């Protein structure tokens, strides 16, 4: 079916009182992303010509958080119902486009379901997303005659007979722009809440002899809204369970799917193994045969084939070539790069530093603003002193260098190829190739030394 051009309206003006937060409800995150951003992404993926965001509470915070240039910001100064919210956006509707109505606190709506709704919308009519619930208390009921949708009755306005209806309105619908504007202009607030309900346009359409087609989502979670943190946490687990299932079916071994969080996009090779309590954030790529230990956090990084990341390691904005080993308890900060076969051990931190092929930093080391060659050994307790209190400086270490334990390299400094730095040395000047650098206080020894004793 050929679809008309389409724009999307996202209602996001609610305060979210039950969240007990200074943050607008729709900015609370699910899978590391604001709820409303999930909805915006779905609208854009669906091909929306325009996305109209109706906002009210916390507008400044919303504008700081949402940088999408495709957004048209529509202010709703008073929250007088869903129909009133749509009336604020109506001046922006084109007559010949379809208008899809979504909600900023319904984050798991899928593009597939929305496309089915869009395809099902009859010419001149309304496409409506509905579900059947065992307990529909509190929801607007779908009324029908001879199987055809005739209207929606809000729970507070429903008769006892209507409250027995199990099919309920999700609030998501699509209609033609010209029709939508005409129906919105006819809305009244003659109801128990004193609000303008968008749902009243269903009865208006029926009275005009327009067809209303109901479509059901693939999963109930797609249309579940969030009003409190408990509901948000439940949807988080639903989402994470779905992502884990997809990864398992695609060949990723998750040791415990219930203890894995994906807060972004994961691209992976074959035979990847991920232990418990691992968090993946942003855009992460894992090569073939990558192993990730328990408690690791990987963010916006590329991990090459055959790498092994031991438990409780944090990797952010880093790039690892093949066969690298990291951790446990290592931290790779933005700009860290490991070439093939490099090793970073426990309690080692790297930032804006490159570790060459086969090079090793095994223990208790800080490497910042550094360029380290191939086959270099960095001894325990080594520190690149890259900051003088005002500016950062670089340390360069050539190939085949041996750096002894407890060494401080005061940048800017260069250590030539094949050099050796003796343990306990503070390097303040460049070291030549194949040279030995040593800066220790000469050792003295006092024979027969007696330790002090406590005075009584």
Swiss-Prot record:
Q: Where is this region: N-acetyltransferase?
A: 251-456
* InterPro entries noted in UniProt: Bifunctional_GlmU, GlmU-like, GlmU_C_LbH, Hexapep, Hexapep_transf_CS, MobA-like_NTP_Trfase, Nucleotide-diphossugar_trans, Trimer_LpxA-like_sf
Q: Where is this region: Pyrophosphorylase?
A: 1-229
List of residues binding acetyl-CoA: 380, 386-387, 405, 423, 440
Q: Which Pfam families match?
A: Hexapep (PF00132), NTP_transf_3 (PF12804)
Active site residues of this protein = 363
**HAMAP family reported in the protein's UniProt record:** GlmU (MF_01631)
Q: Which NCBIfam families does this UniProt record tie to the protein?
A: glmU (TIGR01173), PRK09451.1 (NF006986)
Q: This chain belongs to which protein, by name? A: Bifunctional protein GlmU
> Lineage of the native species?
Bacteria, Pseudomonadati, Pseudomonadota, Gammaproteobacteria, Enterobacterales
Q: Which gene encodes it?
A: glmU
């Amino acid at each position: 079916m050929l679809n008309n051009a389409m724009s999307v309206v996202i209602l996001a003006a609610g305060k979210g009182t039950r969240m007990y937060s200074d943050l607008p409800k729709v900015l609370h995150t699910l899978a590391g992303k604001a709820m409303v951003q999930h909805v915006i992404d779905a609208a854009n993926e669906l091909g929306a010509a325009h996305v109209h965001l109706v906002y009210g509470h916390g507008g400044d915070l919303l504008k700081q958080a949402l940088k999408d240039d495709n957004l048209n910001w529509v202010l709703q100064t008073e929250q007088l119902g869903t129909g009133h919210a749509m009336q604020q956006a109506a001046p922006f509707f084109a007559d010949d486009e379809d208008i899809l109505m979504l909600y900023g606190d319904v984050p798991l709506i899928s593009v597939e379901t929305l496309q089915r709704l869009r395809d099902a919308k009859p010419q001149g009519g309304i496409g409506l997303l509905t579900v059947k619930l065992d307990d529909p208390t509190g929801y607007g009921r779908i009324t029908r005659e001879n199987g055809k949708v005739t209207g929606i009755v809000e729970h507070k306005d429903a008769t006892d007979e209507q409250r027995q209806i199990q099919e309920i309105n999700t609030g998501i619908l699509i209609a033609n722009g010209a029709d939508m504007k005409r129906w919105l202009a006819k809305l009244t607030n003659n109801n128990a809440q004193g609000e303008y309900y968008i749902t009243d346009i269903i009865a208006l359409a029926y009275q005009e002899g327009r067809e209303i087609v109901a479509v059901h989502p693939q999963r109930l979670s797609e249309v579940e809204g969030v009003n409190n943190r408990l509901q948000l946490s439940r949807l988080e687990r639903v989402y994470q369970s779905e992502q884990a299932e997809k990864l398992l079916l695609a060949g990723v071994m998750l040791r415990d799917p219930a203890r894995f969080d994906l807060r972004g996009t994961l691209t992976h090779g074959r035979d990847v193994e991920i232990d418990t309590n691992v968090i993946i954030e942003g855009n992460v790529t894992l090569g073939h045969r990558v192993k990730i230990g328990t408690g690791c956090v990987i963010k916006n990084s590329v991990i090459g084939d055959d790498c092994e990341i031991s438990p409780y390691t944090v990797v952010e904005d880093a790039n690892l070539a093949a066969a690298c080993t990291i951790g446990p308890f290592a931290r790779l900060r933005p700009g860290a790069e490991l070439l093939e076969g490099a090793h970073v051990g426990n309690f080692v931190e790297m930032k804006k530093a490159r570790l060459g092929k086969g090079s090793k930093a095994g223990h208790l080391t800080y490497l910042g603003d550094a360029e380290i060659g191939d086959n270099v050994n960095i001894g325990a307790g080594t520190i690149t002193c890259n900051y003088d209190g005002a500016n950062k400086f670089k340390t360069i270490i050539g190939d085949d260098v041996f750096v002894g334990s407890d060494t401080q390299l005061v940048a800017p400094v260069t250590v030539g190829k094949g050099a050796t730095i003796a343990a306990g040395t503070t390097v303040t000047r460049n070291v030549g190739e194949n040279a030995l650098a040593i800066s220790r206080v000469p050792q003295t020894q006092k024979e027969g030394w007696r330790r002090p004793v406590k005075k009584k």
